[in-house]
Curated annotation (Swiss-Prot):
Protein name: Synaptotagmin-5
UniProt keyword annotations, A-Z: Calcium, Cytoplasmic vesicle, Endosome, Membrane, Metal-binding, Repeat, Synapse, Transmembrane, Transmembrane helix
GO BP of this protein: calcium-dependent activation of synaptic vesicle fusion; chemical synaptic transmission; regulation of calcium ion-dependent exocytosis; regulation of synaptic vesicle exocytosis; vesicle-mediated transport
Transmembrane segments: 25-45
Chief location: membrane
Gene that encodes the chain: SYT5
Residues bound to Ca(2+) 1: D139, D145, D197, F198, D199
Lineage: Eukaryota, Metazoa, Chordata, Craniata, Vertebrata
Membrane disposition: Single-pass membrane protein
Cofactor binding comment, as recorded: Binds 3 Ca(2+) ions per subunit. The ions are bound to the C2 domains.
Length: 386
C-alpha cells in the first residue's frame, strides 16, 4: 500500500564525505617526535628546578656554617688584641723606680725654693722667692710664663707678686718682700706662695702653691728650703668677672689712651639673672680722682662689648705718678648704681696692674691689651706713688 523506500546506491563522486565516518588511520611520525620532545622538555625542567632548590638549601647551610666560623675568628681576634693591649696582671713588669720617675710622680707641678727671716728691730717678716724648678707646662708651646704671688693669711689684701719670667719652667726670681707683722701675731698666720702662669689675654692659671704655717717655723735664724708645689684650691671668693682694655701712651704728645674693649662673666646683679653694665674710668693723681670718663650702658648682658676709647693728657714727668682705675657698675634706673668690681693699673698698683703699665711704657705709641680679673671695690688698694 505504501511505496518501498529507495535502495541506497553508491555515493556520487560529487557528494561530500560524512565527518562522522572519518576513519582513524596511523599517527604520523612527525607528531610522535613532537610529543616526545615536549615531554622531554617538561621532564628536564622539573628536574632542573628540583636541582636548583637542592643547591640553594646546601648553600644556605654552608653560609651559616661559614658565618659561625667567622664569628668565632672575630671573637678570637678580639681576644688576642685584648691580650696584647691589656695583658694579665702577673705579666706586667714593675715600673722603674729611678730618680726621674720619682720626680714625674711627686714633682709634676714643680718645686719652689724660698727663704724666711724676721727682722726683730723693724718687726718685719722677710720672704725671699729664690727660684723654681720643673714647673708644669701650661702653654701650647710646652712652656709657661711663671710668676709668684705672696701673701699672709688671713689677710689677702696685702700681697706681692714677682716679675713674670717668659717661656721657662725653671725661673730664677731672686726677689724679697717684707710684711710688717708683730712677732707675737706670726703664730696664727699662714704664708702662701702661689705660682701662676701669666696670660695676657685670659685668666692667669694657677700652677701650684706652697703653704707654710708660721707656727711651725723657727725664726730664730734665717731659713732656706725647697718645697713641692701642691694643687691650689679653688678661689673661695665669688667671681666678679673679667675686663679687657688696652693702654697706649705717646710720650711726645703726653697722651694716654684707654680703650675699654669688653667684659665677660660678670656677676649677676638684677633679679632676672643679668646686669646692665657700664664702665667708669678715673685718672688718679696723688690718690685723688682728677678726670672721669664712662662708657655707654649695655642692657641685659653679662658679657658686654664696648670698644670705646678715652684719652687723658699726661705729661712725661707725671706718667709715673698717675694711676688709672676702672670700675664696672650695674645701672639701675630707679635706685643707686651698684659697683660690680674694680681694677687699678699704674706704677703704684702692683701685680697685674703694674705689669700692664710697665708693658705700656716699654712699648710707646702701641696699644697693649690685657685681661684683668675684677676685684671687690673695697679690696683695690694703691700703694704710694714713687
Amino acid at each position: 500500500m505504501f511505496p518501498e523506500p529507495p535502495t541506497p546506491g553508491p555515493p556520487s563522486p560529487d557528494t561530500p564525505p560524512d565527518s562522522s565516518r572519518i576513519s582513524h588511520g596511523p599517527v604520523p611520525p612527525w607528531a610522535l617526535a613532537t610529543i616526545v620532545l615536549v615531554s622531554g622538555l617538561l621532564i628536564f625542567s622539573c628536574c632542573f628546578c628540583l636541582y636548583r632548590k637542592s643547591c640553594r638549601r646546601r648553600t644556605g647551610k654552608k653560609s651559616q656554617a661559614q658565618a659561625q666560623v667567622h664569628l668565632q675568628e672575630v671573637k678570637g681576634l678580639g681576644q688576642s688584641y685584648i691580650d696584647k693591649v691589656q695583658p694579665e696582671v702577673e705579666e706586667l713588669e714593675p715600673a722603674p723606680s729611678g730618680p726621674g720617675q720619682q720626680v714625674a710622680d711627686k714633682h709634676e707641678l714643680g718645686r719652689l725654693q724660698y727663704s724666711l727671716d724676721y727682722d726683730f728691730q723693724s718687726g718685719q717678716l722677710l720672704v725671699g722667692i729664690l727660684q723654681a724648678m720643673g714647673l708644669a707646662a701650661l702653654d701650647l708651646g710646652g712652656s709657661s710664663d711663671p710668676y709668684v704671688r705672696v701673701y699672709l693669711l688671713p689677710d689677702k689684701r696685702r700681697r706681692y707678686e714677682t716679675k713674670v719670667h717668659r717661656q721657662t719652667l725653671n725661673p730664677h726670681f731672686g726677689e724679697t718682700f717684707a710684711f710688717k707683722v708683730p712677732y707675737v701675731e706670726l703664730g696664727g698666720r699662714v704664708l702662701v706662695m702661689a705660682v701662676y702662669d701669666f696670660d695676657r689675654f685670659s685668666r692667669n692659671d694657677a700652677i701650684g702653691e706652697v703653704r707654710v704655717p708660721m707656727s711651725s717655723v723657727d725664726l730664730g735664724r734665717p731659713v732656706q728650703a725647697w718645697r713641692e708645689l701642691q694643687a691650689a684650691p679653688r678661689e673661695e671668693q665669688e667671681k666678679l668677672g673679667d675686663i679687657c682694655f688696652s693702654l697706649r701712651y705717646v710720650p711726645t704728645a703726653g697722651k694716654l689712651t684707654v680703650i675699654v674693649l669688653e667684659a665677660k662673666n660678670l656677676k649677676k646683679m638684677d633679679v632676672g639673672g643679668l646686669s646692665d653694665p657700664y664702665v667708669k674710668v678715673h685718672l688718679l693723681q696723688g690718690g685723688k680722682k682728677v678726670r672721669k670718663k664712662k662708657t655707654t650702658i649695655k642692657k641685659n648682658t653679662l658679657n658686654p662689648y664696648y670698644n670705646e676709647a678715652f684719652s687723658f693728657e699726661v705729661p712725661c714727668d707725671q706718667v709715673q705718678k698717675v694711676q688709672v682705675e676702672l670700675t664696672v657698675l650695674d645701672y639701675d634706673k630707679l635706685g643707686k648704681n651698684e659697683a660690680i668690681g674694680r681694677v687699678a693699673v699704674g706704677a703704684a698698683a702692683g701685680g697685674a696692674g703694674l705689669r700692664h703699665w710697665a708693658d705700656m711704657l716699654a712699648n710707646p705709641r702701641r696699644p697693649i691689651a690685657q685681661w684683668h680679673s675684677l676685684r671687690p671695690p673695697d679690696r683695690v688698694r694703691l700703694l704710694p706713688a714713687p
